[in-house]
């Protein structure tokens, strides 16, 4: 998909279901676009080996919950392939601070000292951005270049081949992308985006985290532990950092 493509391998369970999409002409055009931007000196985030990190962290059969984001953070060292997440040591972005505030109000879990959400992903929370790359300082720079078709296909495949998932759709963009989800097969929870611009309009107070766990328990599944270990106890071996 990118310069260094040989080092990027889609996780096997995902490759079996959505890997063919990466061979389509529009994805080859996206690959060419990424190479051109890098050749022009653009800083593309996240680093190549982390572009598909959400799939590596949460294999297809292990998905319980899907959180849809828009595109990666565009600051130096922020994006590492999981939506809303940043690597340990990077300041927690404002939207994630509001997510933590809601978790604390909903479940009584104290805010962690970092923004690294890999422990959620390893429990079955697919942290998926609609667009998987961005350029430094240019939010949305890679929108409408081909990623959306691929991630639409991912959502549609989960919708058709899995049952009983929880989709957390925050903001109009995620809700539009989630229109294909069959609400007779899956639990869909909607709220405004956790951005400081909109969180007060209904994200804060949505109680999506307890509602997610209630649904999982009803299906006989283990709930998500939304608490995060302190930064000093994190396992960062799979970040590529």
From Swiss-Prot:
PROSITE patterns named among the record's database cross-references: U_DNA_GLYCOSYLASE
UniProt entry keywords in alphabetical sequence? Cytoplasm, DNA damage, DNA repair, Hydrolase
Per the UniProt entry, the Enzyme Commission number(s) are 3.2.2.27
Residues at the catalytic site: 71
Q: Which GO terms describe its molecular function?
A: uracil DNA N-glycosylase activity
Q: Give the reaction(s) catalysed.
A: Hydrolyzes single-stranded DNA or mismatched double-stranded DNA and polynucleotides, releasing free uracil
Q: Where in the cell is it found?
A: Cytoplasm
Predominant location: cytoplasm
Gene3D superfamilies, alphabetized: Uracil-DNA glycosylase-like domain
**InterPro entries tied to this protein:** UDG_fam1, Ura-DNA_Glyclase_AS, Uracil-DNA_glycosylase-like, Uracil-DNA_glycosylase-like_sf
- Enzyme class comes to hydrolase
Q: Name one GO biological process term.
A: base-excision repair, AP site formation via deaminated base removal
Q: Which SMART domains match?
A: UDG (SM00986), UreE_C (SM00987)
Q: Which GO terms describe its cellular component?
A: cytoplasm
Q: Show which residues constitute the signal peptide.
A: none
Q: Which NCBIfam families match?
A: PRK05254.1-1 (NF003588), PRK05254.1-2 (NF003589), PRK05254.1-4 (NF003591), PRK05254.1-5 (NF003592), ung (TIGR00628)
The record, for PANTHER family, names: URACIL-DNA GLYCOSYLASE
Concerning its family, UniProt says: Belongs to the uracil-DNA glycosylase (UDG) superfamily. UNG family.
Known HAMAP family for this protein? UDG (MF_00148)
Q: What does this protein do?
A: Excises uracil residues from the DNA which can arise as a result of misincorporation of dUMP residues by DNA polymerase or due to deamination of cytosine.
UniProt-recorded name of the protein: Uracil-DNA glycosylase
Name of the encoding gene: ung
């Amino acid at each position: 998909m990118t310069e260094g493509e040989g080092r990027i391998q889609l996780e096997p369970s995902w490759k079996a279901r959505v890997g063919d999409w990466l061979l389509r002409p529009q994805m080859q055009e996206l690959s060419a676009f990424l190479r051109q931007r890098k050749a022009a000196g653009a800083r593309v985030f996240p680093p190549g080996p982390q572009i598909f990190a959400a799939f590596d962290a949460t294999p297809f059969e292990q998905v319980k919950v899907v959180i849809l984001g828009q595109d990666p953070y565009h600051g130096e060292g922020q994006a590492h392939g999981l939506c809303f997440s940043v690597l340990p040591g990077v300041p927690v972005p404002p939207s994630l601070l509001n997510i933590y505030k809601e978790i604390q109000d909903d479940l009584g879990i104290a805010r962690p000292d970092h923004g690294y959400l890999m422990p959620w992903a390893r429990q079955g929370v697919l942290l998926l951005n609609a667009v998987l790359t961005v350029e430094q300082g240019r939010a949305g720079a890679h929108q409408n270049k081909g990623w959306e078709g691929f991630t639409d296909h991912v959502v549609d495949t989960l919708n058709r081949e899995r049952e009983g998932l929880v989709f957390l759709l925050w903001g109009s963009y995620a809700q539009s992308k989630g229109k294909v989800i069959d609400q007779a097969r899956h639990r869909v929870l909607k709220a405004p985006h956790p951005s400081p611009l909109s969180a007060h309009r209904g994200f804060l107070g949505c109680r999506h985290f307890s509602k997610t766990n209630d649904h999982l328990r009803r299906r006989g599944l283990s709930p998500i532990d939304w608490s995060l270990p302190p930064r000093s106890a994190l396992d960062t071996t799979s970040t590529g950092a």
